[in-house]
Structures are given as C-alpha cells and as structure tokens.
C-alpha cells in the first residue's frame, strides 16, 4: 500500500490591512513564546538530576525516564507539525503516548492511497481508515488490480500442463484467481466506505478502480460477480454506503468516481442535498460498464450543479441538453471538460444526442478558458468524424486501440481543426503482431504526424506506439517543435528507417536518429526501449484518470 500525506505548515494570517498587520504581529509573538517554552522544556529535561552525561541526557529524551512520554498532547502535536512526514513517523515510535498523538486530525488533512487488490492490504487499510476516516478532509483511493492474466503465480503449475487437459486446468486456476481478486476488491471498497460514512468534514472524495484487467475476460458482472456476490447483498451495501456518504456530506466540493464496479447508480446523486450540489466544483463519473441506455447523470440533475468548474463524463452521456444547461446564466462558466469515448458505450448508446457545433461555440463563448480532454478507446474512424466537431476547444486527445486503428485522415483533421489548442497527443495501438504496424503516411505526400507538429504550435507532449514512425519524420517533428515539445515518447519497435539510411555504411542510423532528435529538442532523447515501462500503454485507464484529475485542477 502506497500512502501519500500532506504536511500542513503554520502560516500567519494575511496582513493587507492595519488590523491584519496587528494580527500577524500577535501571531509571531505567540509563535515565539511557544518556541521559547519548548526550548526551555527541552533544556529542563536534559538537565534534570541524574541525567548524567550530555549523551545520556540526549538519549533520555526518547525514554520514559526523561519525561518525554509525559509531555502534553498539544505540545507533541505542535512538535509533529514542524516535522516532515518521515520524521514524524519515526518520532512517533519513541513511546505509546507519542504514537497516540500521531493521528491528530490537524496533521492528516489529506490521504492519498494506492492499494493493490490483495488480502494483505486489508488490515493495513482498516487501521489507517479507522484512525483517519472520520475526520480526513481529502481522500483519494486507487484500487490497482494485479494482472492475473499473466499467471505464473506460486503453485499454479507454471505452464507445465499441455494439451486440452492443461488448458482446462489453467482456465480453472485463472477463474479461481479472478474470484479471489474480486472478493478482495469488494471487501476493500466496503472498508473505505464504512470508515467515512459519518465524515462531515469531507471536501474532496476520489475513487478509482482498476477493473479493466478483469473486464478483459468478458462481462464481469455476469460471470464472476454473480459467484462472489450471488444475492447482490455486498453490491447493494456498497451502493447504500456511497449514497449515505453523499447525504451526510456538508462541505463536499470535489466528487470523482472512475471505473468503480457498480458503485455509482443513476440515482446516487439524488442523495446530495441541494446546498452541497449548488457548491460542488468538480464532478467526474466515469463508468463504461453501465448497461443499455442508463446514464449516471441527466441534464435535469445537472441543473443543481450551478458552481461546476470541471466535469468528466462518458461522451455518450454528455448530451446537447447538458451543454445547454451548462451555458445557462445561473451556471458559472465551465473551465474543463473530460470525455471518455468507449466502444462499449458507442455500441449500446446513440451518438444522435451529442452536442452540435453551435453548442460547443456557446460553451466557448461563456468561458474563453474552456478546454476539452478526450480519451477514445477503440473508436471507428466514422464515429470519430461525427464526434470531432470543429468548435471543440480540444487541448488533449488520447487514442487507445486494440482492434480499430486510427487513420491518417483523423490525425490530419485534428491538426487542422485544433491547431490553436492542442497540447497533448497520445497514439497507442496494442497490436499482437509487431511486424507490421499501420503507417499513417501511407499514400500521402506529407506525414500526418509531421503536419500535426507543424500546425499545432502549442504541442508539448507526443507519445506513439503501434504505428510506424519513419526516422526522418521523427527528426522533422523534433526540429519543428524544438524545446517546446517537453515529452516525446516513441517506442523503439515503432521506428522505421528508409532503405537509403540503412544502406549508408558510414553512418549508424540509430545513433544518428538519437543525435538529431536530441539536437532538435534541445535535450537528451532516446526511444522507449521497454513498452512495459510506459504507463500510458500498460495502464490506460489509470493514466487517463490521473491526467483528468490534474487537467481539472489546472484552472
């Protein structure tokens, strides 16, 4: 379990007025008195009778005899507030009294937890949430399912079985692992929700569930979920707890739920009071597993969220009526919109209700800083042509394909329509056969990626895998954008060379490519050698969710 906590440092109040200056002076005098008392107390503890040598006095501070354990809790918390997180944890190990003061609410305003879906995480999570769940103001939890498809676990046979019988055994073992990870996932989610059900201080609440690995085997809810939770009691309990948290909240400004298995329902947001909904600043509800025409939020429900600065939804749920609601005079201008376009949603939901070009123009008129981030999973070119309206202020776009490849025409369209806005362009193709990547420049006079770099003058990130990138075009991209292109990630297997470059015996083509691209960018560059190290490829859902969070916060 990875844990990130913020350490609040005391700051004086503002001094813009005479009264403010007086408050600052009083605050500084008070802090100085506190520090003097603290130094005096430490000197007394060092110099008390029987303390012995200077070394003994120093060492005794950590022991019961020196009186460190008898310090008032307020003073210990005050000492903790000056320490960075690692030192704070080490200091709490001195005695039980100091450990009791470690979880004082003022010391833990934020909790950011990344959990492996493993039974070993449960006792640690229970301890932490029992200590902090009732008062924490910002809680971000990510559930990371291990890739059980890789197999090879201890005692699983290690691939020794062959033939039909071996395949059946492997399928049974794989099924058992799916059931175990799903059962653990539900328990961990319950642990988090139970601990914060009565927390009225909660201001930011973010949940991410990495269930994409599980869904690779098909319809998760119809197979493994029915075995783990046959009567649906746990799922219903989780949904009720989530709604209870929303109904009990009084200060919630940020609600984000992405790819969490059947936690959010179409009726969940109705649990929020009007007072909380009216002050909500960020809302993201991402779940491509919702069946049929169901949506997690409707245009009528969105009317209550008059203070939204950022919004993240499934593209098929973002309708023309929603765009109209967001442009109403009683709504504050929307600054950031993140949209997930998934082939599963497109197959089950219609694109007929999506905003037209006039709706996008109205949103841009209401806020000149309005920007859009789109993530597209396996979307056909004809559908992308419908989605990419000219007036969308598209700043970031991420293509992730398994079956359907992006065409050169789509890349060319993006470079022409969004040249004033585009900063991030990601092109990922998870193909099994790496011997023949699609070539976007095929039958074209100019390479679409080079044109993208030429037209989009704000481009700062370009990542490509699974598409042929010619070495001379890569050099051209680096020279066109120069040092403004902060990130250029291209996998080694995606790069190809002309026969003329390979035939030149005097020049090493790979070395020349690295040298020329580095010169163009003004910084050292090399191709991505190990695709597994590229998180945008191995964990596209998590990458999109984290980027969506930072995109929404960057206002």
Curated annotation (Swiss-Prot):
One of its GO terms (biological process) is protein ubiquitination. Residues 65-111 form the F-box domain. Keywords: Ubl conjugation pathway. The keyword Nucleotide-binding does not apply. Part of the SCF (SKP1-CUL1-F-box) E3 ubiquitin-protein ligase complex SCF(FBXO33) formed of CUL1, SKP1, RBX1 and FBXO33. Interacts via its N-terminus with YBX1 CSD domain. Directly interacts with SKP1 and CUL1. Pathway: Protein modification; protein ubiquitination. It comes from the Eukaryota. It holds the Pfam family F-box-like. Gene3D superfamilies: 1.20.1280.50, Ribonuclease Inhibitor. This is F-box only protein 33. InterPro entries: F-box-like_dom_sf (IPR036047), F-box_dom (IPR001810), LRR_dom_sf (IPR032675). Transmembrane segments: none annotated. Substrate recognition component of a SCF (SKP1-CUL1-F-box protein) E3 ubiquitin-protein ligase complex which mediates the ubiquitination and subsequent proteasomal degradation of target proteins. Probably recognizes and binds to phosphorylated target proteins. Recognizes YBX1.
């Amino acid at each position: 379990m990875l844990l990130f906590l913020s350490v609040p440092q005391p700051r004086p109040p503002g001094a813009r007025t005479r009264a403010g200056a007086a408050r600052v002076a009083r605050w500084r005098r008070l802090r100085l008195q506190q520090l003097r008392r603290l130094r005096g107390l430490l000197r007394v503890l060092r110099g008390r009778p029987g303390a012995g040598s200077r070394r003994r006095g120093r060492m005794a501070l950590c022991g019961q005899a020196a009186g460190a354990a008898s310090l008032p809790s307020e003073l210990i918390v005050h000492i903790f507030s000056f320490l960075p997180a690692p030192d704070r944890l080490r200091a709490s190990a001195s005695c039980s009294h100091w450990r009791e003061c470690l979880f004082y609410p003022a010391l833990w305003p934020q909790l950011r937890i990344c959990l492996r879906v493993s039974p070993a995480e449960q006792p640690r999570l229970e301890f932490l949430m029992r200590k902090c769940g009732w008062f924490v103001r910002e809680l971000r939890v990510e559930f990371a399912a291990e890739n059980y498809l890789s197999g090879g676990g201890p005692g699983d046979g290690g691939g020794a079985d062959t033939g039909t019988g071996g395949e059946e055994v492997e399928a049974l073992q794989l099924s058992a692992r799916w059931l175990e990870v799903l059962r653990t996932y539900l328990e961990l989610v319950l642990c988090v929700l139970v601990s914060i059900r009565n927390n009225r201080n909660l201001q930011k609440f973010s949940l991410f569930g990495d269930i994409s690995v599980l869904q690779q085997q098909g319809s998760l809810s119809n197979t493994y979920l029915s075995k783990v939770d046959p009567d649906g009691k746990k799922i219903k309990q989780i949904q009720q707890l989530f709604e209870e948290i929303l109904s009990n909240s009084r200060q919630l400004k940020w609600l984000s739920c992405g790819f969490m298995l059947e936690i959010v329902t179409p009726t969940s947001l109705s649990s929020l009071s009007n007072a909380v909904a009216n002050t909500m600043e960020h809302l993201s509800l991402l779940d491509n597993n919702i069946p049929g025409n169901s949506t997690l939020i409707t245009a009528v429900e969105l009317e209550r969220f008059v203070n939204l600065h950022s919004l993240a939804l499934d593209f098929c749920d973002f309708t023309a009526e929603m765009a109209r609601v967001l442009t109403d005079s009683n709504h504050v201008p929307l600054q950031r919109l993140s949209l997930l376009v998934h082939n599963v949603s497109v197959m089950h939901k219609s694109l007929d209700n999506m905003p037209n070009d006039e709706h996008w123009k109205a949103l841009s008129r209401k806020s000149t800083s309005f920007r859009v981030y789109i993530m597209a999973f396996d979307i056909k070119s004809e559908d992308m042509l419908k989605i990419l309206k000219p007036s969308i202020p598209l700043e970031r776009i991420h293509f992730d394909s398994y079956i359907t490849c992006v065409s050169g025409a789509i890349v060319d369209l993006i470079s022409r329509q969004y040249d004033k806005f585009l900063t991030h362009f990601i092109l990922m193709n998870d193909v099994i056969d790496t011997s023949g990547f699609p070539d976007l420049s095929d039958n074209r006079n100019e390479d679409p990626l080079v044109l993208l770099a030429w037209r989009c003058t704000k481009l700062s990130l370009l990542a490509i895998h699974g598409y042929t990138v010619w070495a001379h075009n890569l050099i051209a991209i680096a020279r066109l954008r120069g040092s403004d292109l902060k990130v250029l990630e291209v996998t080694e297997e995606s790069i190809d060379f002309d026969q003329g470059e390979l035939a030149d015996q005097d020049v090493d083509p790979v070395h020349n490519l690295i040298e020329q691209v580095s010169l163009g960018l003004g910084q050292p560059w090399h191709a991505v050698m190990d695709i597994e190290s590229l998180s945008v490829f191995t964990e596209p859902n998590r990458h999109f969710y984290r980027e969506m969070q930072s995109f929404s916060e960057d206002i």
